[in-house]
From Swiss-Prot:
Name of encoding gene: speE
Protein name in the entry: Polyamine aminopropyltransferase
Catalytic activity: S-adenosyl 3-(methylsulfanyl)propylamine + putrescine = S-methyl-5'-thioadenosine + spermidine + H(+)
Enzyme class per UniProt: transferase
UniProt-listed GO biological process terms: spermidine biosynthetic process
């Protein structure tokens, strides 16, 4: 943060995106991270964690719909039990609860203060999802929860902060962690994770794909443009192949499974999001790294 007026968000060690800030609603250094709620001049209300924009009112729906719906629509059966790790704004939870079949949505976040801020300032994100009777909110470390849970899930959604070295999410992008997730999935289940930016950290994006494919065998990658992130943003899915869904299948499953409106995701945006451009696809052939606990991948910024 540069004073109270500008956020200088470092995308790489040698470039940043400057955001003009109109107002600061709340700011606190929690035991886990530095959390700030602001009003951006261009993007409206927004959440910043450790100097990185997490989401803004302008385009959060694009991120959250592409994170959730390709996974849940590609499951062979409509999901009943869904686990969310992270996603403190409540918007991922909001999208999961649009599924008529969902009986229980467990959301695990390490930082109670983020949830508190979201409930107070980010209604446009959660839209009451925290109070839904199907919601189970757990405040704990994600890895601790995974190690201790006795339940199994139809889908696991990882809406985590970037794998910045020594951050709270640093080790939640490794082969060993994904193996733990595989162990608590029901048969036919799948996972998705936000996978950083093909624009600024292409090697990380591809390595996350490689790591998930190593564990789940079936994997696919999507991307979209996020104006508030100043570039492309990526997602990786494991255990299922949403990229193989036809446009007709996407449309029919939206009608069958979802109650409520979608603002971004439809058959056409699905097709475009999984149509990786040639220059990005070529990197999947060149980069072979798999992220492990001994040699984890991380965003350099």
């Amino acid at each position: 943060m540069f004073g109270w007026h500008w956020l200088l968000e470092w995308q790489t060690p040698y470039e940043f995106h400057g955001h003009l800030i109109e107002k600061v609603f709340a700011e606190e250094k929690t035991p886990y991270q530095h959390v700030t709620l602001v009003e951006f001049t261009r993007f409206g209300k927004g959440l910043i964690i450790d100097g990185k924009v997490q989401s803004t009112l302008y385009d959060e729906h694009i991120y959250h719909e592409l994170l959730v719906h390709p996974l849940l629509l590609s499951l062979p059966k409509p999901p009943k039990n869904v686990l969310i790790l992270g996603g403190g704004e409540g918007a991922t939870l909001r999208e999961v609860l649009k599924y008529k079949s969902v009986e229980k949505a467990v959301m695990v976040d390490i930082d109670e203060k983020v949830i508190e801020f979201a409930k107070k300032y980010l209604y446009e994100w959660h839209q009451g999802a925290f109070e839904d009777k199907r919601t189970s909110l757990v405040i704990t470390d994600g890895l601790k929860f995974i190690n201790e849970t006795k339940d199994k899930y139809d889908a696991i959604i990882l809406d985590l902060t970037d794998p910045i070295k020594d951050s709270t999410s640093y080790m939640l992008y490794t082969k060993e962690f994904y193996e733990k997730l595989r162990g608590i999935l029901n048969q036919g289940g799948g996972i998705v994770t936000q996978a950083t930016s093909p624009s600024f950290s292409l090697e990380v994006y591809v390595t996350i794909y490689n790591t998930i494919k190593e564990v789940f065998k079936e994997a696919s990658a999507s991307y979209t443009y996020m104006a508030s992130f100043d570039g492309l943003w990526g997602f990786v899915y494991g255990g299922v192949r949403p990229d193989l869904l036809s446009e007709d299948e996407v449309n029919s499953r939206i009608r069958e499974r979802i109650s409520g409106q979608l603002r971004f995701y439809d058959d056409y945006s699905h097709k475009i999001s999984f149509s990786l451009p040639k220059n990005i696809k070529s990197e999947f052939k060149k980069i072979t790294k798999v992220s492990t606990e001994k040699d984890p991948i991380y965003v350099p910024a």
